[in-house]
């Protein structure tokens, strides 16, 4: 049995920043994550993906961001319980008790759920025999950008992942086709502007109004990606690689059975302190939903600060918390 001030579920960027915020208030944390390492999707799915909306970093790789967040949290000595899921929740008076899939038991007065998309996997396009090409020519995640150097690549999708990877891989690929069923992209406007600028150079060809239709190749080696528009017009794209980016399947797993207000794979929270319908349990980051929610890492950082400050009052039996700037707090620690 472990006793702690706060249990954090999820060790992605928002979970890691929550450790720091808790530490600044003198709160001890135990952290549960299903992956073997910290970092969440940033490490598991796209360690080399450039992130553009972190203050003071015009551009930073996901892996580097996680490294810095882990370093920032380290002085507060968090206890990580990795490669295990939070399974059972029990309430005993003012305390919560969580049991994990490895029978680890942790007790605290506050829980911060920063589980991102929960358990995740790719939404795969419904193409015949696509599994024959997976891992050889078809990839849903990128963890080694260099292996795509000099390739002809088809990227399918219209969101941030598709657009950002098209921009990034255009630096090393021979040719990129970006296939999207509409001419309008849902990525950040500045990213779309960069995409269209690069398209004018010919490094990226925008294949809009089309959807994936079939794959052609031998022994897992892709030769052609066939696309079709609404009028059944066919185009054959000469390609070595297909990168379908159609988002992730979300599964909250055991969290869905805890009595939380869950809608469409998200946890409903108030938009003041991000508390759920169960007092003492908070949800922040991509897993949380409230009116006006923006799914940004930056938003999750702000939610971490607000929720942990509110949790402090519960953890320390109503003790008032007086706000101080980080420079003052660090000065006191030294």
Swiss-Prot record:
Annotated InterPro entries: FAD/NAD-bd_sf, FAD/NAD-binding_dom, Fd--NADP_Rdtase_type_2, Ferredoxin-NADP_redctase_2
Gene Ontology molecular function terms on file: ferredoxin-NADP+ reductase activity; flavin adenine dinucleotide binding; NADP binding
Enzyme Commission code(s) on record: 1.18.1.2
Reaction catalyzed: 2 reduced [2Fe-2S]-[ferredoxin] + NADP(+) + H(+) = 2 oxidized [2Fe-2S]-[ferredoxin] + NADPH
Keywords assigned by UniProt, alphabetized: FAD, Flavoprotein, NADP, Oxidoreductase
Cofactor(s) this protein cannot do without: FAD
Entry keyword Flavoprotein: yes
Chain sites annotated for binding FAD: 33, 41, 46, 86, 120, 286, 327
Cofactor binding comment, as recorded: Binds 1 FAD per subunit.
Top-rank taxon: Bacteria
Record text on subunit structure and interactions: Homodimer.
Family according to the record: Belongs to the ferredoxin--NADP reductase type 2 family.
PANTHER family: THIOREDOXIN REDUCTASE 1-RELATED-RELATED
Name of the protein this chain belongs to: Ferredoxin--NADP reductase
Organism this protein belongs to: Rickettsia akari (strain Hartford)
């Amino acid at each position: 049995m472990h006793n702690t001030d706060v249990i954090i579920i999820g060790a992605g960027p928002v979970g890691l920043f929550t450790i720091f915020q808790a530490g600044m208030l003198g709160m001890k944390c135990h952290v549960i994550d299903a992956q073997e390492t910290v970092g969440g999707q940033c490490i598991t799915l796209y360690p080399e993906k450039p992130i553009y909306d972190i203050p003071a970093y015009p551009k930073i790789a996901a892996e580097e961001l996680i490294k810095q967040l882990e370093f920032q949290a380290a002085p507060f000595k968090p206890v990580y319980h990795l490669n295990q899921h939070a399974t059972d929740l029990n309430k005993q008076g003012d305390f919560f008790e969580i049991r994990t899939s490895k029978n680890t038991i942790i007790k605290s007065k506050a829980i911060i759920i920063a589980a991102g998309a929960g358990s995740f996997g790719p939404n795969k396009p419904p193409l015949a025999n696509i599994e024959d090409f997976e891992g050889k020519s078809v990839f849903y995640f990128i963890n080694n950008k260099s292996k795509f150097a000099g390739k002809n690549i088809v990227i399918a999708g219209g969101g941030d992942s598709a657009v950002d990877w098209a921009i990034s891989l255009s630096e090393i690929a021979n040719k990129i086709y970006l296939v999207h069923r509409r001419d309008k992209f849902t990525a950040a406007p500045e990213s779309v502007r960069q995409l269209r600028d690069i398209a004018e150079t010919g490094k990226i060809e925008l294949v809009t109004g089309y959807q994936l239709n079939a794959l052609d190749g031998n022994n897992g080696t892709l030769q052609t990606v066939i696309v079709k528009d609404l009028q059944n017009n066919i185009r054959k794209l000469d390609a070595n690689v297909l990168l379908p980016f159609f988002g992730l399947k979300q599964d909250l797993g055991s969290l869905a059975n805890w009595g939380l207000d869950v809608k469409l794979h998200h946890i409903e929270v108030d938009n003041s302190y991000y508390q759920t319908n169960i007092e003492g349990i908070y949800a922040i980051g991509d897993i949380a939903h409230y009116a006006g929610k923006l799914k940004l890492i930056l938003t999750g950082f702000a939610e971490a600060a607000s929720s942990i400050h509110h949790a402090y009052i519960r953890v320390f039996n109503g003790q008032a918390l007086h706000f101080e700037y980080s420079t003052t707090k660090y000065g006191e620690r030294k």
